[in-house]
C-alpha cells in the first residue's frame, strides 16, 4: 500500500453534500481532499434539474446564510424562478428555480478547483481505515492510502448501486456512472449498520419531438427572486416549462404492465420515497384519479433534453414509450435517456450524533443521501454541517448544532439522528413546529451571525447583513414613532387607500398591521423613507404576524430549558431504575445529547423523561 498524502479532512463523494462539506472544511482553514468517482460529475443533478420547492428552499436559504455555496450557484445558473404557495402565509412561501444543470455542475467544479486548502481527485475509495476506534484514512482501488484526521461520508446513491428497468437490472449509478461496489463491506466491517433504499427518475425526452402547442405554458415569475442573500434581485425568466396530464389510456397501459415493474415483481428490495412516488405507484394507489399532472422541464439552455417531472418509473422501455405517447404533447416523443429505479446502501442515521459524527468511530462523519435522505437540498445542508463540525472537532471546539427552533437544518438533523427513517427522508414545512419563526425570508437574520462566529461568513456578506439589519431596525423605529392623527386629511387619505378610518391618534406601525396595507403603501402615503423589497417584506411580516410570532417564541423558551439539560455520554440507561425497558433500549441505542432530544425519541414517555430529569439533577449535584 502506497501512502500518497495526508490531509486534515477527506470528503468521500462529489455530490451536493460532498461539495458543501469540502468547501466548508477548506474555507475554515483545513487541508481537505474531495475524493470523487468522476471529476466530470461534480454536483451532478441526476434527477430533477431544479433547486428549492416547499421546505427545501428554506434549507437553501439557511445554507446560504451560514456561508454555503448552493444558493449562489443556483442563482447564477437559474433559467426560471417561481415563488410557490403565494396564496398561503409567509411561513410556507417557497422559492423554486429551474436550473441549467450543466452550468450548475461547471460552476461548482470551478469553485471547488479554485478554493484554497482544497484538492479534488478522481478516486474510487474501497476501504475505510480505522484504528482504536478512530478514523485514520482511506484506501483506493489502486492500493493508494490517503491519511486523514477526519473523514466525511457523502456517498449518495453510489454504495452498491443497482439500476432497474423492467426485467433488466445491472450494477450502476446515476447517469450510467460507476458505483462503489466494495466500500459498503468496509463500513460493515467497521460496525456501521446499513440500510437499503430505492429512488427513481423519469425519462429525459427530446424537445424536438414534442408537440408544445398541445401543452400549457408554465412561465416563471416576473418578480425578482434569489436564493442567496448576497445576490442582487434580478429577473431570471429565460425559459418556460410546459404542463400536461396523463389520461385513462395512460393508466390502462401502466396497469396492464404493472407485473413488469420491479417494485411489483419483487426485484426491488429497497424502500422507496413516500413523497416522490413512481407513476405506477400513483396509478395503483390513486386508482380513482382520472389524470395526474406532469411538468415538462428544460435541463438547460444548451441541450434538447427535457425532464418529465411526475413520471418517475422503472417500467420496461417498450412500456415507457407506450404510455408517454398517450400524453398530450408527447404523441411523437423520443426518449434520450430511459427512466429507471436505483437501489443503494445508506447508513442508519441513528448511529450519528447531532453533529453528524458516527458515534463509535472518532473523526468519521456522514452527510446527504448516505444518511437516508432524498434531495439535493437536504444533502447540501447536511454536507455543510458535517464539514463545519469536522473542522470544529479538529480545532478542539464544541460542535455546531442547530436547534429545531433555530433552523430547518436543525429539524432535518434532529429527525434523522433521533427518530431515524425507514424511507428516503424529504424535508417539508409541516415537519417544523416553529414554521412562522423559520421562514425562508429571515434565514439571514437567524443564522448569519452564527456563520460569522464559525468563520464562513466573510466581510462582504457581513457588511450586507449588518446594513439590512440596521435598515429593518430603522424602519420599525420610524413606524413606531410616526404619529397618525384622525384629521380630515388623514381620514380622506385612509379612505383612498381602501382602509377604515381611525377614531383616535395611532402610529404608522398600527396601519401596517392592517391586512389591506403594507409598509410600501403606508410609506408612500405618509412620505416615509422607502427601503429595498427584502427589508420592506421583513417589516411587513414582523408587524402583521407579531402576535403569532410571540406565541411561538414563548413555546421555544419552554423547550429550550430541556435542550440545555445535557445528558452524560457515559450513562448506561439499563441501570436507571424507573424507566421502561423500551426506553432503556432506545436511549442506549440513540444516546441522546440532551433531555430535549430524549423526549422526542419514540418509546420514551413523559414519565421516562421525568425520571431522567431527577437522575440528571442528582448526577449534577454529585459532581
Predicted feature residues:
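Conserved beta-strand-loop-beta-strand element in the redox core of flavoprotein oxidoreductases
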Residues: 129-145
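Internal hydrophobic alpha-helix adjacent to the cofactor/substrate pocket in enzyme cavities
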Residues: 379-400
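Conserved N-terminal/central alpha/beta ligand/cofactor-binding core
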Residues: 6, 23-127, 142, 154-171, ...
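A glycine-rich dinucleotide-binding beta-alpha-beta segment and adjacent secondary-structure elements
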Residues: 307-373, 401-414, 532-586, 591
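Extended, charge-enriched "interface" segments that sit outside catalytic cores
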Residues: 431, 448-453, 457-610, 614-623
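Short hydrophobic core segments
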Residues: 12, 145-156
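Beta1/beta-strand and adjacent pyrophosphate-binding region of the FAD-binding site
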Residues: 3-17
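An anion/pyrophosphate-binding glycine-rich loop and adjacent beta-alpha core
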Residues: 38-40, 83, 185-321, 418-491, ...
